[in-house]
C-alpha cells in the first residue's frame, strides 16, 4: 500500500498523443513486438499475450519498474536521450544486448487503444497509471490505485500493459498469430518464451516452439510458476 500519492507525468506534448497514437502503427503485431522487446530488455523469461473479450493484455516477468528509484519516470520520458555508451547497451543482468527500441515505442499501445493501463511491480512496490490519447490534465496521467493493480501470471516482479477495447484484434488462428510474431521478433529461446493465451482463438496442432499456444484453461495452473 502506498503511503503517499504517486504522480505520473508524461514528458511529451499531449497534443502529439492524439495525432501520433492512431498513426504510429497500423499492425497489431508491431505493437506487440514493441512490448515483447521491452520485456526482453527487462531480462524477462516469459511474456504472456492474453487476448480477452474487451482487452489485450501483455505481461512479463522482467525486473519491473520502481517509482521510488526513478525507473517509472524514466519510462515516461518518451523524449529521452538514446543510449550511446557500450555499458548502457546491455540489460541489467549483463546477459543480453538491449533491442534498442526508440522511446516513442512506449506509446505503441495507443495505436490500438485510446486507453491503456500500465502496471508494474518491483521489490514489492506497485505502480500503475493510465495512458490516454486525450489526457484530461495535460501531461499528468491518471494513477491506478494499489487495490486496482492486478496481475494474472506475474507475482513478485514484472510489468503489465492492458489495451482496453482495442481497435485491432489478433488473428482467429493461433498458428497465424505465432507466425506473425516470429517474423517480427525471432529472438525466442529456452530463456525467453512467449505465451499466447486466448479463450476464443482456434488452437491448431503445431511443432514444439518457444512461442507457446495456450488456452486459458490450459494455463490456470501456471500462476504458481512455469
What are these regions (language model features)?
Residues 153-226:
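Glycine/threonine-rich ATP-lid/beta-loop region of ATP-binding domains
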Residues 1-160:
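GHKL (Bergerat-fold) ATPase N-terminal catalytic module, capturing the glycine-rich phosphate-binding loop
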Amino acid at each position: 500500500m502506498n503511503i503517499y500519492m504517486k504522480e505520473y507525468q508524461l514528458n511529451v506534448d499531449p497534443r502529439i498523443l492524439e495525432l501520433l497514437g492512431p498513426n504510429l502503427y497500423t499492425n497489431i503485431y508491431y505493437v506487440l513486438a514493441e512490448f515483447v522487446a521491452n520485456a526482453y530488455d527487462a531480462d524477462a523469461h516469459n511474456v504472456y499475450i492474453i487476448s480477452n473479450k474487451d482487452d489485450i493484455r501483455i505481461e512479463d516477468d522482467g525486473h519491473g519498474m520502481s517509482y521510488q528509484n526513478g525507473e517509472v519516470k524514466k519510462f515516461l520520458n518518451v523524449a529521452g536521450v538514446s543510449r550511446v555508451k557500450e555499458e548502457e547497451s546491455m540489460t541489467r543482468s549483463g546477459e543480453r544486448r538491449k533491442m534498442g527500441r526508440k522511446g516513442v515505442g512506449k506509446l505503441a499501445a495507443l495505436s490500438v487503444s485510446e486507453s491503456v493501463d500500465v502496471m508494474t511491480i518491483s521489490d514489492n512496490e506497485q505502480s500503475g497509471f493510465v495512458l490516454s490519447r486525450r489526457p484530461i490534465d495535460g501531461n499528468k496521467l491518471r494513477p491506478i490505485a494499489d487495490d486496482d493493480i492486478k496481475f494474472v501470471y506475474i507475482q513478485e516482479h514484472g510489468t503489465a500493459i492492458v489495451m482496453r477495447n482495442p481497435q485491432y484484434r489478433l488473428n482467429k488462428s493461433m498458428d497465424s498469430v505465432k507466425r506473425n510474431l516470429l517474423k517480427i521478433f525471432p529472438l525466442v529461446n529456452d530463456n525467453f518464451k512467449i505465451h499466447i493465451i486466448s479463450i476464443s482463438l482456434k488452437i491448431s496442432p503445431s511443432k514444439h516452439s518457444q512461442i507457446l499456444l495456450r488456452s486459458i484453461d490450459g494455463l490456470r495452473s501456471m500462476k504458481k510458476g512455469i
